[in-house]
From Swiss-Prot:
Transaldolase is important for the balance of metabolites in the pentose-phosphate pathway. GO terms for biological process: carbohydrate metabolic process; pentose-phosphate shunt. This is Probable transaldolase. Pathway: Carbohydrate degradation; pentose phosphate pathway; D-glyceraldehyde 3-phosphate and beta-D-fructose 6-phosphate from D-ribose 5-phosphate and D-xylulose 5-phosphate (non-oxidative stage): step 2/3. CDD domains: Transaldolase_FSA. The lineage of its organism: Bacteria, Pseudomonadati, Bacteroidota, Bacteroidia, Bacteroidales. The gene is tal. One of its GO terms (cellular component) is cytoplasm. GO terms for molecular function: aldehyde-lyase activity; transaldolase activity. Keywords: Cytoplasm, Pentose shunt, Schiff base, Transferase. It is an enzyme of class 2 (transferase).
Length: 218
């Protein structure tokens, strides 16, 4: 399973990359706004900076919600760097745009997916990735991980090549559950990635090893 970090913060991306386990980055308009990045030109520069840090796919989202606008923005984003994956919302014009991009050899990430039906259409249109939102489904008492499992099974049944990218990951349990049901990728905050390292017995064991070493070696 691949690990992507869900952020537009360059320092967090560098820190995650330094761990040696980072496979890519996902961003969205909210994350870009959080970093105070204004204007298309500055956004494009920021995407290029991210691509220079990470040797992996970088999802950059279109803002337009109509077909023509998505095509224009998506082609501009794809031209920035070979690592760019154009992120497109799972709406009617989005599915049309994904088909267009697929025919042009431009890779896509179909985002804001909340049902297996949406995921099925995205794969049929040729999406490179599909992003079911685990945490947001859990927030409304639906089974986010269950949706990931359902999509994985559907794709295996019909041999779709679209990768299941579990998004809206809130904690380490989400990561492990998505791994168990066969997600190809999880994208999550740095805190969740680092959280996988934490276990009290590791800390206790290390403390004992060091204490025993000092008894003998001073």
């Amino acid at each position: 399973m691949k690990f992507f970090i869900d952020t537009a913060n360059l320092e967090q991306i560098r820190e995650a990359n330094a761990l040696g386990v980072l496979d890519g980055v996902t961003t969205n308009p909210s994350l870009m706004a959080k970093e105070g990045i204004k204007g298309v030109e500055n956004q494009h520069k920021h995407y290029i900076e991210i691509c220079n840090i990470v040797d992996g796919d970088v999802s950059a989202e279109v803002i337009a919600t109509n077909y023509e606008g998505m095509i224009k923005e998506g082609e501009e984003l794809a031209a920035l760097n070979p690592h760019i994956v154009v992120k497109v919302p799972c709406i009617e014009d989005g599915i049309k745009a994904i088909k267009y991009f697929s025919n042009k050899g431009i890779r896509t990430n179909c985002t804001l997916v909340f049902s297996a039906g949406q995921a099925l259409l995205a794969a049929k249109a040729g999406a490179t990735y599909v992003s079911p939102f685990v945490g947001r489904l859990d927030d409304i008492c639906n089974d986010g991980v269950g949706l990931v499992a359902q999509i994985v099974e559907l794709y295996q049944t019909y041999d779709y090549k679209t990768q299941v990218l579990a998004a809206s990951i809130r904690n380490t349990l989400h990561i492990l559950q998505c791994a168990e049901v066969g997600a190809d990728v999880v994208t999550c905050p740095l805190s969740a990635i680092k959280g996988l390292l934490n276990h009290p017995l590791t800390d206790i064991g290390l403390e004992k090893f060091l204490a025993d070493y000092k008894k003998v070696n001073g």
